[in-house]
Amino acid sequence: MFSPLSRIRGIVADTVAMVVYCFLTGMAIEIVLSDMSFQQSLSSRLLSIPVNIVIAWPYGLYRDRIVALALRLNADSRWGKNIADLFAYVSFQSPVYVAILLTIGAEPSQILKAVASNAVISMVMGVAYGYFLEYCRRLFRVSVSPRPQIVSH
């Protein structure tokens, strides 16, 4: 169904999208909303790069399945997809984010602020990331179905 080259392009597209998006949005949240220093945020973002490389493809698969399920249950594909993107992003990223912040030595209050802020902002970010991910997939010529099927890359 998918050629090996198509799978590789899909993995690379998902990885580029995850690394770029999480670096930029994470740094903004950590500095502006969570009272982290630039150094703490930079440490967090640099640590997040290898983590995001590892989780990007599994997240892409997870997100595609959540979106496909939501679209199957909801005839209004735009709202269903947006809600699915929000749910997938928050439910997958929050535990990973806590682990990163613990690793860099953030204070519990900073972690709580950062994760809570991220969850609230994810009401927009998760949806925006879904569109950014699909944009990256198009850049890498990965087929993007308007109604994703439950398949693995």
UniProtKB/Swiss-Prot annotation:
GO molecular function terms attached to this record: L-amino acid efflux transmembrane transporter activity
InterPro entries membership: Ala_export_AlaE
Database matches in Pfam families: AlaE
Compartment list: Cell inner membrane
Any one GO BP annotation for this protein: amino acid export across plasma membrane
GO cellular component labels: plasma membrane
Superkingdom classification of source: Bacteria
TM spans (from-to): 11-31, 42-62, 86-106, 114-134
Membrane-topology descriptor: Multi-pass membrane protein
UniProt keyword annotations, A-Z: Amino-acid transport, Cell inner membrane, Cell membrane, Membrane, Transmembrane, Transmembrane helix, Transport
The keyword NADP belongs to this UniProt entry's keyword annotation: no
Protein family membership: Belongs to the AlaE exporter family.
UniProt function note: Exports L-alanine.
Name of the protein: L-alanine exporter AlaE
Native source organism of the sequence: Dickeya chrysanthemi (strain Ech1591) (Dickeya zeae (strain Ech1591))
